[in-house]
Amino acid sequence: MDAPVPAAPAFGGSWAKLNPPLSPWILDVINSMGFKNMTPVQAGTIPRAVKNQDCVVEAVTGSGKTLAFTIPVLERLSRREEPYKKGEIAAIVVAPTRELATQIHAVFHHFLSSLIPPESEEETGDVEAHAPPFASSSRSPSPQTPDKPLFPLPMLVTSGTPTPYETFQSTHPSILIGTPGRLAAFLLNPRGLAIVRVSELDVLVLDEADRLLSSPDHRRDVERIMRHLPKQRRTHLFSATMTDAVEEMIGLGLRNPVRIVVNLKDKRKDGEEPKERRTPMALQNTYLVCRHAEKTLQLIRLLLCESTKHERSKFIVYFSTCAAVDYFYRILSRLPSLSKFHLTSFHGELPPKIRETALSTFTSHPSSHLSPAVLLCTDVAARGVDFLDIDVVIQYDAPTDPKTFSHRAGRTARAGRRGKAVVLLGKGREEDYVGTFQSANAELMKRKRQKAQRSILDFLNIRKIPLTKQPYINAYLEEVDTPQALDPEATTLLHSIRQIILTDRELSDKAAKSFVSAFRAYSKHEASFIFRTLDFDFNSQAISFGLLRLPAMPEIKDWKKKKEAERQRLEKIKSEGGEVEEKEIIEWEDAGVNWDTFAYASRQREAARLATLAQRADNQSSNDAARAEARAKRKIKAEMREAWSEQKERKVRKEERKEKKDAKKKYEWELEQANGEGDRQSDLANIAKAQAERKKRREREEESWDEEIGKEYKSLKREIKEEKSVKESSKGGAGGGGIGGGMFDDLE
């Protein structure tokens, strides 16, 4: 590989200074978009990409990478002497997500649609007006001039593209943009092999290459596409971060590539070494430390503080899982304190059409500080999707993959705008995520480094992502130090969320699901030496999620055992006069809920739940009867295994107990009569008579009971003997060696 290209200046210069110069029609479109000057990544990439060079481009998010590959593709297409024939492909752009592919398609479409003459636009206006933003459109043939050639519009190949082969045959696009799986299926399907010709392909672009190659499925599809394409092509890789997988792909799929790295450096005083960074210079990157129980409270206060005090109007909030996004969207949208906010849910498990609608609703919302817009999402919106007007990014959960941190934060402070990013971190060990103790006691820092094998501190500083501390926000939206005890408002918020959940059992199900999924994501964090499951406080997290009760998880059961063992250990140390470091204990109490009557708001789901309860009750009664019969069988089997002498002794002991009981009652009665008055002899006769009657009555009851029980006993005993004989016969049949094994069965 060639030596890295020197970093471009802060401003890449005028578009007119490019060498070789761009076509006039491309410059016209750029000027109409309002871009007066190039960014450094554009100035470094476009001249080399227009020529016959493969490019590997690493630049911070929001630096203009999309135009850096769009313009060279169009310029090479415009300079080609022989136009492409129908069915031939000039360029393919691969993006990891549908949203990013749609955005890239819109940029290509904007350039190429500018070549359609006004009269042609009027003829096809009705078609274009009703066409979806991802669909390619055909156009009427019009005369072209050297200044304004005519090219077919690009085609988007994603999960939302209807009838792709019909669209391809009707529009004959020269440029395909799509996701890896859909593109691979489109190109390598027998029908695609027949109608899509790639022998003349000129350029392949891999946008967000690190994400494309980090996913096994994406990587497999990308490799299939690359094997299908001609080797004599230009290949460009673009990303904000470079990984080992990207480096491997550079060696396999590129020819003599040039590496273009655009760095940002903080300004320093004279004599100080400037520090590199991987986030935009206009970004205020911060972190806020709180207890896990206070995270939702701090999220709400951040939204209120930034919108009211700083007049921010557009926010993105990142969660680690789709279940958490779905749950918090339903809860936060019903909190009175956030009634003025317009919330949108966006994650990968939504159907493509709903995702598209959600994204469109958020971007088009006329937000202001009086009516802010908030997008609750997962990392599906962390890369490539270009939000030009995001004011604040809040990371409720630190990303599982630390490389995603810069991509999340980079959704704001784009195209020269200022922006703010905040990540919420748990109090304690999670503070090491940003090197909180770097300026603390040097000796303490040294011991911590040795204990954690010199790897836990300054995690993001090592990754060239500088952060500053965001103070805790109190109930008056004032910035203060993190409170020593749990914020009382956290408990108040817990009760408010519980009141919302109690309106629909489905919310309780979603709360439990999101809680479990959040812990699973926490346990899979790549920085597991910082985000340790051993330090995870389930009680604290449950308060933040507003749960009615802790879910049945084996991890919680083990955690409670360890917690109790630790408590007993500390109490023992205290009783022996030792000193114990007091640790904060956050208590948890389940909500008082009658789970049998707690209903779903949906009539269908509630009817299904009640039917399940009834079925469970029937099964319970039948199970109780089966268990009683099993107990009786076990008792009979035990008696059958007893010796005859033991059975006789047991009966004798039973009779002795009865006689002792009668003698005791007689003695008690005689004692009462000795203290009273009356005819002694008459009373004794009455006693003997009553005693004889009781004995006869008991004998009759025992006879009837013995008769009933005896029948059941004999029936069970007969059943046990039959089971035993069946087992013995099956054993004999399996053995096949002795007389009982059926050796002479055929001699009759």
UniProtKB/Swiss-Prot annotation:
SUPFAM superfamilies in the record, alphabetically? Answer: P-loop containing nucleoside triphosphate hydrolases
Residues that coordinate or bind ATP? A59, V60, T61, G62, S63, G64, K65, T66
Do you know which CDD domains this protein is assigned to?
A: DEADc_DDX55, SF2_C_DEAD
Compositional bias per record (Basic and acidic residues), positions renumbered to this chain: 626-669, 708-730
Gly residues bias: start-end ranges: 732-748
Q: Which Gene3D superfamilies does the annotation name?
A: P-loop containing nucleotide triphosphate hydrolases
Q: What is its main location?
A: nucleus
Q: Write out the residue ranges of the motif Q motif.
A: 15-43
Q: Where is the composition biased (Low complexity)?
A: 132-142
- Intrachain disulfide bonds: none
Q: Where is this motif: DEAD box?
A: 207-210
Annotated catalysed reactions: ATP + H2O = ADP + phosphate + H(+)
Tagged with keyword Hydrolase: yes
Helicase C-terminal domain: which residues?
A: 295-460
Query: What's said on domains?
Result: The Q motif is unique to and characteristic of the DEAD box family of RNA helicases and controls ATP binding and hydrolysis.
Q: What is this protein called?
A: ATP-dependent rRNA helicase SPB4
